[in-house]
Amino acid sequence: MKFKPLHDRVLIEVLDSSEKTAGGIIIPDTAQEKPQEGKVIAVGGGAKTEDGKLIPMDVKVGDKVLFGKWSGTEIKIDGKEYSIMKESDIMGISGK
C-alpha cells in the first residue's frame, strides 16, 4: 500500500468488533456504545506548533488503539477499508 497520512493523521485498520452477545442476540450498530479497536497502519509526521516546532506522534505503526465509533473518515485503499483520523481522536493505546 502506498499511502502516507499528513501532519497528525493516522491510518487505522478497523478490527472486527463483536456484533452478537454471548447468547447469540445481534446488536445493531446504533446500540453498540463500546469504542472501536484498530491497528495503526501508517502515521503522519506530526503536527506543528505556531512557531514551527514539530509535535511528535504518540502512536506508531503496529499499535492497537481504541477510538470512538464515529471518529475519523472511512476510506478504501487497494480494495480494503480503513479509517483515517487525527491522533487526538484516538482514546488510547491498548495492550498488545
Swiss-Prot record:
It is found in: Cytoplasm. Its main location: cytoplasm. The keyword RNA-binding does not apply. It comes from the Bacteria. Heptamer of 7 subunits arranged in a ring. Interacts with the chaperonin GroEL. Together with the chaperonin GroEL, plays an essential role in assisting protein folding. The GroEL-GroES system forms a nano-cage that allows encapsulation of the non-native substrate proteins and provides a physical environment optimized to promote and accelerate protein folding. GroES binds to the apical surface of the GroEL ring, thereby capping the opening of the GroEL channel. Belongs to the GroES chaperonin family. This is Co-chaperonin GroES. It comes from Pelagibacter ubique (strain HTCC1062). The lineage of its organism: Bacteria, Pseudomonadati, Pseudomonadota, Alphaproteobacteria, Candidatus Pelagibacterales.
